[in-house]
Regions:
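Terminal alpha-helical segments
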Residues: 1-154
Length: 154
């Protein structure tokens, strides 16, 4: 376990996270899903809302992958599991606080778009895609360090 191990254990004791076995197979499937969603987000013939949803889903999957790398998943038996995954990025992947706040604002925007029908602006879409790409690069670097990616594995 890495950088925020004690914090993550405390989150598990509070019922916000569940301890799970680290699984390279699951992690690589999650990475593939995130890459696919990010590629879908780049399809300009889709609406901004669809593209935003794809980019946000990539962020969420990558945040979940960060938890997996540390032997946890967000507890789905409680509300707020997306928020828990994002807010733990500091402890799972070393994401700085200001970026976590941006990602949380994108989560809130996703809820407004998904539940209230708010339209997604080109600016918000671009920010979501930029954040998804940056998080993907961070995850890929971590997976290379863990030996999950490398020659013939990418």
């Amino acid at each position: 376990m890495g950088m925020g191990a004690e914090h993550l254990r405390n989150q598990a004791r509070a019922g916000l996270l569940d301890a799970i076995p680290v699984s390279m197979e699951l992690g690589l499937r999650m990475l593939h899903a995130a890459r696919t969603r990010l590629a879908d987000a780049a399809l300009t013939q889709a609406s901004n809302e669809t593209r935003f949803d794809c980019a946000y889903t990539a962020i969420r999957v990558l945040a979940d992958l960060g938890l997996l790398l540390n032997g946890f998943r967000a507890s789905t038996s409680r509300p707020g599991h997306h928020m828990a995954a994002l807010q733990n990025l500091k402890h799972t992947l070393g994401v700085d606080d200001s970026t976590v706040r941006v990602l949380d604002s994108l989560r809130k925007q996703r809820n407004l778009a998904g539940y209230d029908g708010d339209l997604v602006t080109a600016t918000v879409l671009a920010e979501c895609m930029t954040q998804a790409r940056a998080l993907l690069l961070r995850v890929e670097k971590r997976l290379e360090e863990e030996g999950w990616l490398g020659e013939g594995r990418r």
